[in-house]
Amino acid sequence: MSIPLRPGAAPAPAAPRSSAPDPLAPLLDLPGVREAADAARAGIDRLLRHKVLRRESAGVSTESALRGARASAALEGADVPLAELRAGDVTDPVVQGALRVSAGLGAMVETWPRAPGQVLARLHVLAATDLADPAALGRPAAHAGPRLSGLIALITGPTTLPAVLVAALVHGELAALAPFGTSDGVVARGAGRLTGIARGLDPKAVSVPEVGFAELGREAYGSALAGYASGTEAGVAGWLVHCCRATEHGALEGLAICESLLRG
């Protein structure tokens, strides 16, 4: 299982210059956000410079996908040993859904910036098969429509906001909105990771942000998400900083994978 990027796939182009103000730009000035985003970017850059990635990026991405799926499932309460996952002995539907999402991200990178609604539906099908009514797979609830439209505008529109923060907003919106009613957390984390890949934060898909969230703890994750859902300045800032910290931890996990491959 891996996150195979299609040949020729490239990071999303830089946002075009515009005289109109960027409505998301003020988020950088929230307490602690700019510093956290810079630290996350620096952590990813250190990972991307690792010499193993010059010859083994596919292997690192494969391992990253596996560890990311395990951590995403663990955040849902389905915590299984990595060794069992490698052996293929795990049948838990939450874990299987997380594995399918991780494995499917690479094929979605090019479509995500153009047709995010289509990709979100596919992510839910992957995550929630065996957990939701087949008729409900890929179909967001009616109440989610207006807010999903806003999210789609965020994903497809230009912004000067760093990619790590755009990924955090995508993740937070989906997790807080829970548009599908099942497996929304797995979908949200998959969409957040996909945003980071597509916007050039981690174009090789070698970091493991899901492990970062898991290492910071389920309680801290839930608390930060509740803060974001509150809509307060402090709550939004707290979520963005939390996501940046998870990204830093995820970069360290990627470095650990690189080192393990280097040792053989």
What are these regions, as identified by a protein language model?
Residues 1-264:
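FIC/Doc superfamily catalytic core
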